[in-house]
Amino acid sequence: MALMSAVEYPNVAILGCGKLGQALLVGLLRSASGHPGRVKIRELKVTVRSARTAQLVRERISPLLRDRAVPPVWILQQDQNCNVAEQADIVLLGCKHSSLGELVHDLQGMRHDHRRILISLMGGVSPGLIVEALHFWTGPVVRAVCSVAVAVGESITLLSTSDDHTNDAESRRAVTELFASVGVVQWLPECQMHVASAVGASSLAFFAQMIEGLAQGVAEQHSNGANNAQQLPLETALAITAQAARGTAALLQQSTSPADLVAQVATKGGATAAGLRVLEKEKLVQTLRTCAAITAEATAALSQSAGSHGEDNTTDSKTSRA
């Protein structure tokens, strides 16, 4: 059967629905609700380790299932990995990199009655390592690095493939369309994926801390002896700062360079210039460079530890439409 076209509806499986898997599940359902027909998924099946996780996933997606445009979702225990993968056209590996060995064991007996695309979301694990571990896999193998922003359709998803499992045009289009429904897609050579991951996925945590720090600087409970009447509630400060960050990103995406943007905002002797002097004194830019470099190195190191043991246990259940 064809994997994805304008008229066919593939089955998608997410094996190991942790934080990133849940975010992707939510993003795909929201895309189906807001843009029906953009990516035509017939059915979604996810596997989890525990009844508790199954309940959390169910609660998180329940409001989205009220829309008739949203495909049905099945939440199954992880010992169903093989059966779930056999019934899928696109299989996403959402477990931790340390669970690769366990996953290989689960999938060894699966039938290869039709061609499936395998997409790994595991941090630091190259397509080559996946191909080596799943030597019995006959279809295309792709590595995807996305962030939890897939839940709101704002992720940058970085994609690469193995030389041994180069994708045909149809498979490449299917993967591109799947992730384009939850953000922006960029294909890269595998050799660049570790460094790109540092700024494409991990950086959300860094940006969040920067936004929080800026907001705290003008918030009531963090004022340095200033008149509290002049301070903002933290929630308000966070909302303002987050929107300013969004505006910054939008300008940079329209080809405004960072240096030009700084020059547009900061005037000699002005308030912004005073703040920039603090950042320069504290060596913020150098700190961020070091942060990105260390994160990239740590991502590369993950591939060395892939294949150990991983997650937990659950009960079969179908998520009903609300």
From Swiss-Prot:
Transmembrane segments: 9-29, 117-137
Protein's membrane topology: Multi-pass membrane protein
Enzyme class of the recorded protein, top EC level: oxidoreductase
Residues bearing attached sugar chains per UniProt: N313
Primary residence: membrane
Gene3D superfamilies per record: NAD(P)-binding Rossmann-like Domain, ProC C-terminal domain-like
Catalytic activity: L-proline + NADP(+) = (S)-1-pyrroline-5-carboxylate + NADPH + 2 H(+); L-proline + NAD(+) = (S)-1-pyrroline-5-carboxylate + NADH + 2 H(+)
Subcellular location: Membrane
Statement: the UniProt record of this protein carries the keyword NADP: yes
InterPro entries per record: 6-PGluconate_DH-like_C_sf (IPR008927), NAD(P)-bd_dom_sf (IPR036291), P5C_Rdtase_cat_N (IPR028939), P5CR-like_CS (IPR053790), P5CR_dimer (IPR029036), Pyrroline-COOH_reductase (IPR000304)
Pathway it works in: Alkaloid biosynthesis
Sorted UniProt keywords: Alkaloid metabolism, Amino-acid biosynthesis, Glycoprotein, Membrane, NADP, Oxidoreductase, Proline biosynthesis, Transmembrane, Transmembrane helix
GO cellular component: membrane
Family annotation (Pfam families): F420_oxidored, P5CR_dimer
Entry keyword annotation includes Glycoprotein: yes
PANTHER family: PYRROLINE-5-CARBOXYLATE REDUCTASE, PYRROLINE-5-CARBOXYLATE REDUCTASE 3
Family according to the record: Belongs to the pyrroline-5-carboxylate reductase family.
Protein name as annotated: Pyrroline-5-carboxylate reductase
Originating organism: Penicillium fellutanum
Organism phylogeny: Eukaryota, Fungi, Dikarya, Ascomycota, Pezizomycotina
